[in-house]
């Protein structure tokens, strides 16, 4: 019988959430995503030692540039194995500075183009803060497509759609983690708050004709993935991709256009900030995610500095 991974690929674009070249070659996803935490793991792999050294040689003492050069080198190597796109993230410490994020996104695209990679194969990942969404809006108008990450709330999703961003990455597992901790119980299938969040966003986007791609991210188990079968894209860790590849049985499509959704709404900055503030889970998880990515960025910089 066809594996659940192959069945999933029939109605959802499968993306690998990793910088592990071997896993990508084995699992054959369409796209791949990276972030500072995954790049830090990649930096510890012997196969990337040459990329680290080259980044330091080319950066002229600018450690931030060295990190971008390393990210692009990893991204280019991944693109040799996949037909689609790579997502590369802007320094999370810039998450509240619109113009700095625009400039960093433009630099990353410039580095990819210098490496012979067209911008059509790259998504610039940016945190879904108000400032990040505004930066993405500017980049999209300049022909640079974006992936809005660390998205935990319907408010963030609405603002991203209104800004015309190419893709959003709502985080299923981290939402699940928060509710499991605070409610003291487990969740399965359609009752999982993370699954419910992505389902709501998907239905809203399809009902109102938004072109923004919904890519569920941050999964804790195969059940969450199966409950979102039919979502535009799902970015999945090699471990869970492996489990799906080994699983048999029928996988039913759960999300599809045409399901009912709520009326269209519009958000200005005040209503965005209030809506996010009213969602304790999203507020905590957005701040925590930015801090974690910033810490891993600093660790990567320290690693590169040691090579200087």
UniProtKB/Swiss-Prot annotation:
- Identify the main location: cytoplasm
Q: Show the InterPro entries listed in the entry.
A: Aldolase_TIM, TAL/FSA, Transaldolase_1, Transaldolase_AS
One GO cellular component assignment for this chain's record is: cytosol
Q: Name one GO biological process term.
A: carbohydrate metabolic process
Q: What class of enzyme is it?
A: transferase
Pfam families reported in the protein's UniProt record: TAL_FSA
| Catalytic reaction list | D-sedoheptulose 7-phosphate + D-glyceraldehyde 3-phosphate = D-erythrose 4-phosphate + beta-D-fructose 6-phosphate
Q: Where in the cell is it found?
A: Cytoplasm
Q: What is annotated as the active site?
A: 125 (schiff-base intermediate with substrate)
Cytoplasm found in the keyword field: yes
Biological or metabolic pathway of the protein:
Carbohydrate degradation; pentose phosphate pathway; D-glyceraldehyde 3-phosphate and beta-D-fructose 6-phosphate from D-ribose 5-phosphate and D-xylulose 5-phosphate (non-oxidative stage): step 2/3
- What molecular function does GO assign, one term? transaldolase activity
Q: Which family does it belong to?
A: Belongs to the transaldolase family. Type 1 subfamily.
Function of the molecule: Transaldolase is important for the balance of metabolites in the pentose-phosphate pathway.
What NCBIfam families does the entry give? PRK12346.1, talAB
Q: How does it assemble?
A: Homodimer.
Q: What is this protein called?
A: Transaldolase
The species this protein was found in? Stutzerimonas stutzeri (strain A1501) (Pseudomonas stutzeri)
The major lineage groups are: Bacteria, Pseudomonadati, Pseudomonadota, Gammaproteobacteria, Pseudomonadales
């Amino acid at each position: 019988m066809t594996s659940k991974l192959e069945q999933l690929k029939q109605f959802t674009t499968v993306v690998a959430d990793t910088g592990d070249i071997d896993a990508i070659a084995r699992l054959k996803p369409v796209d791949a995503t990276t972030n500072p935490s995954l790049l830090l793991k990649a930096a510890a792999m012997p196969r990337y030692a040459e990329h680290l050294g080259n980044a330091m040689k080319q950066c002229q003492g600018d450690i931030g540039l060295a990190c971008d050069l390393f990210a692009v080198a990893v991204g280019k190597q991944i693109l040799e194995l996949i037909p689609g796109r790579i997502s590369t993230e802007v320094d999370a410490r810039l998450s509240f500075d619109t113009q700095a994020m625009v400039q960093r996104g433009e630099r990353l695209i410039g580095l990819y183009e210098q490496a012979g990679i067209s911008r059509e194969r790259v998504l610039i990942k940016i945190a879904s803060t108000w400032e990040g969404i505004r930066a993405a809006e500017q980049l999209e108008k300049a022909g640079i497509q974006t992936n809005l990450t660390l998205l935990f709330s319907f408010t963030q999703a609405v603002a991203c759609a209104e800004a015309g961003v190419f893709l959003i990455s709502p985080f299923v597992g981290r939402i699940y983690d928060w509710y499991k901790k605070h409610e003291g119980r487990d969740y399965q299938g359609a009752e999982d708050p993370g699954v419910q969040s992505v389902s709501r966003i998907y239905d809203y986007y399809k009902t109102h004709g938004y072109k923004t791609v919904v890519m569920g991210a941050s999964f804790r188990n195969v059940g969450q993935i199966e409950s979102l079968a039919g979502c535009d894209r799902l970015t999945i860790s090699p471990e869970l991709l492996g489990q799906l590849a080994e699983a048999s049985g029928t996988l039913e499509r759960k999300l599809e256009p045409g399901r009912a959704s709520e009326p269209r709404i519009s958000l200005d900055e005040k209503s965005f900030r209030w809506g996010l503030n009213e969602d304790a889970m999203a507020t905590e998880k957005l701040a925590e995610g930015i801090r974690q990515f910033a810490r891993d960025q600093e660790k990567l910089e320290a690693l590169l500095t040691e090579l200087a």
